[in-house]
Design a protein with these regions (language model features):
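Acidic donor-diphosphate engagement hotspot in glycosyltransferases and nucleotidyltransferases
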Residues: 136-137, 164
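Structured loop/turn residues at beta-strand edges in well-structured enzyme cores
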Residues: 22-23, 50, 122, 167
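A glycine-rich helix->loop->beta "capping" turn
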Residues: 12-31, 35-40, 123
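C-terminal helical subdomain
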Residues: 61, 126, 145-168
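A conserved hydrophobic alpha-helix of the Rossmann-fold in NAD(P)-dependent oxidoreductases
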Residues: 9-14, 137
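Rossmann-fold cofactor-recognition segment
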Residues: 1-8
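Catalytic loop of short-chain dehydrogenase/reductase
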Residues: 33-72, 76-119, 128-134, 152
Length: 168
């Protein structure tokens, strides 16, 4: 377990993984996100710097830290996958400041792919499955309303289940 807000834990993770042989890790799943909505979702322009930076560090920059920690043990043809959202190009009010942070996560995927291409063939991808009922989404104010609305808009007229994403 690694708390990405604590640099000593990230350093310990890096040291632990650096002891592994190269090609030990064939794939990494980054599924880390957090946003402080203790005061509820506020209009975007009222976002507090402290909350924005904390959410960016945990939800986006942690992918860079994780990739660096695993770099020496990651297979040359390995894969790094993160979980994004499907609404980085729309403005879902209930998602608050997390939409631009998830957009930065997707940008990090592209830049990590380019950066790692200098020395490997590691693939970086983001899975943007759409609204899912998860323990994390339960903490997003108004999420259920958007989840039920999105369910009506899908071609199959039913929500995507977390098991469907996990089994792909």
């Amino acid at each position: 377990v690694c708390d990405f807000e604590k640099s000593d834990q990230v350093n310990s993770l890096h040291q632990l993984i650096s002891q592994l042989d190269s090609d030990s890790i064939h794939g990494i799943l980054h599924s880390i996100a957090f946003a402080n909505y203790s005061e509820g979702v506020q209009p975007f322009h009222q976002t507090k710097l402290k909350d924005y930076l904390q959410a960016t560090h945990i939800s986006s920059f942690s992918l860079i830290e994780l990739a660096n920690a695993c770099k020496t043990a990651l297979s040359q043809n390995g894969s790094v996958v993160t979980i994004g959202i499907s609404s980085t190009e729309v403005t879902a009010e209930n998602y608050g400041f997390m939409a631009p942070i998830k957009a930065s996560l997707e940008a990090n995927v592209r830049y990590l792919a380019k950066s790692f291409s200098a020395f490997s063939s590691v693939r970086f991808n983001s899975v943007n499955a759409g609204p899912l009922k998860t323990s994390a989404s339960a903490g997003i104010p108004g999420y259920l309303k958007n989840y039920l609305f999105a369910e009506k808009l899908t071609f199959r007229k039913k929500a995507l289940l977390t098991e469907e994403v996990a089994n792909t």
